[in-house]
Amino acid sequence: MKLAYWMYAGPAHIGTLRIASSFKNVHAIMHAPLGDDYFNVMRSMLERERNFTPVTASIVDRNVLARGSQEKVVDNIVRKDQEERPDLIVLTPTCTSSILQEDLENFVARAQLDAQGDVILADVNHYRVNELQAGDRTLQQIVQFYINKARKKGDLATEKTPQPSVNIIGISTLGFHNNHDIRELKTLMAELGISVNLVIPDKASVHDLKKLPQAWFNLVPYRELGLPTAKYLEQEFDQPYVDITPMGVVETARCIRAIQGAINDQGATADYEAFIEEQTLHVSQAAWFSRSIDCQNLTGKKAIVFGDNTHAVAMTKILAREMGIHVVLAGTYCKYDADWFRQEVSEYCDEILISEDHGEIADAIARLEPAAIFGTQMERHVGKRLNIPCGVIAAPIHIQNFPIGYRPFVGYEGTNQIADLVYNSFTLGMEDHLLEIFGGHDTKEVITTTMSASSDLNWTTEAQGQLNKVPGFVRGKVKRNTEKYARAQGLSEISLEVLYAAKESVGA
């Protein structure tokens, strides 16, 4: 456990709660001290939910510490079972309450005697895994629980649907543009003549999970959520899965071809080549845009990409392959899946950074001085401090990246959205310079381009005035070069003479 003022992936219990609250009529009981129960507020605000978040905190207080938790936890489970009538109650501790080392399995067994619905304990090690890994494990656990339950009852639906069908696995609450992506994926499947059997966990009933084996194949659009579940279903029912994220023109085509292979292996005679060509050349604007003069203006411009594995890999490939943008650094905070990330992006970028430390990423951005950043909410903050534009492409995100309008990132409409995001993220031509010449509300003060809080150098008024005359898009570089020169000369003050000497030293 570590104290941090910014985390890319939250603690494990957040992942479990995201899965539980994504299902329909499932309630989560969180065994936690006050302070760990912020999930309800976060979800209600970010997802703009009309309904109450189905999560209850069973607070660990001094009475619990004195007498033990069993009575309180069991009472809370039974009370919620009677009040809400959920199909399933998931009990989860947090990393804080795990310190108590209580036998929560026993609490669940005791509560199950009085509860009408099912009760399970989230099988997650809260010290070893983060939000993404815990969500992945919880989804697999719930699917396994209901598959085994149906098997015992003898009503497991294993016969395939007459026409090709798919389970879409991994759409959850608080996911990056998930509610837009699922609409686009459903549209894409309909155009391919494939019916959607189930979408899990988003708005799915746990009683429908026994129908999962009926689909011809499983689609896992995000690497962070759903892969273990798909592998379990493949192992149990010989059900193939496609785990290619359909993001960008090239990867969407690759995903569709993989789907074609999966259903044709089971007796279908699908041929999607004409569909891919039609969408790529005429429906999606992205392929046309990438050959236009607007996009050619971006060729060779430097960009940094950072996010979760799915979005960072997809974005790196789109920028490098489809738009000719020079990716100087690609990074991820998913350290547990670092090998896959390296394998996917190594040929498309100069540097790879795998880190959960936002300061390390900020320093890399300041060092490399890209023309644009594509990252999370944190990289957006860094970009604002460094005066570098940033397009947000991955969670964690704030409210403005839960848009009300339709903004998918996957499929062919997703390619249009990404093209817009990329183009609008770069500062166009002399835009900044013109704004400064003509003044107005957009005039910017000089800001430092180092991520440290203070500088050991003082600028004289004359030198600062001269620096202000430098066009905005190179001013940061001039400032850094001058300060670097001053430090090398052992100076503590930067005057006009020092500024000119620094300029000469770099041959400008």
UniProtKB/Swiss-Prot annotation:
InterPro entries: ChlB/BchB/BchZ, LI-POR_suB-like_C, Nase/OxRdtase_comp1, P-CP_red_C, Protochl_reductB, Protochlorophyllide_Rdtase. GO terms for biological process: light-independent chlorophyll biosynthetic process; photosynthesis, dark reaction. GO terms for molecular function: 4 iron, 4 sulfur cluster binding; ATP binding; metal ion binding; oxidoreductase activity, acting on iron-sulfur proteins as donors; oxidoreductase activity, acting on the CH-CH group of donors, iron-sulfur protein as acceptor. Component of the dark-operative protochlorophyllide reductase (DPOR) that uses Mg-ATP and reduced ferredoxin to reduce ring D of protochlorophyllide (Pchlide) to form chlorophyllide a (Chlide). This reaction is light-independent. The NB-protein (ChlN-ChlB) is the catalytic component of the complex. Its cofactor is [4Fe-4S] cluster. This is Light-independent protochlorophyllide reductase subunit B. Gene3D superfamilies: 1.20.89.20, Nitrogenase molybdenum iron protein domain, Proto-chlorophyllide reductase 57 kD subunit B. Belongs to the ChlB/BchB/BchZ family. Binds 1 [4Fe-4S] cluster per heterodimer. The cluster is bound at the heterodimer interface by residues from both subunits. Its EC number is 1.3.7.7. The keyword Oxidoreductase applies. HAMAP family: ChlB_BchB (MF_00353). It holds the Pfam family PCP_red. Protochlorophyllide reductase is composed of three subunits; ChlL, ChlN and ChlB. Forms a heterotetramer of two ChlB and two ChlN subunits. The active site is at residue 294. It is an enzyme of class 1 (oxidoreductase). The gene is chlB. Pathway: Porphyrin-containing compound metabolism; chlorophyll biosynthesis (light-independent). It catalyses: chlorophyllide a + oxidized 2[4Fe-4S]-[ferredoxin] + 2 ADP + 2 phosphate = protochlorophyllide a + reduced 2[4Fe-4S]-[ferredoxin] + 2 ATP + 2 H2O. [4Fe-4S] cluster binds at residue 36.
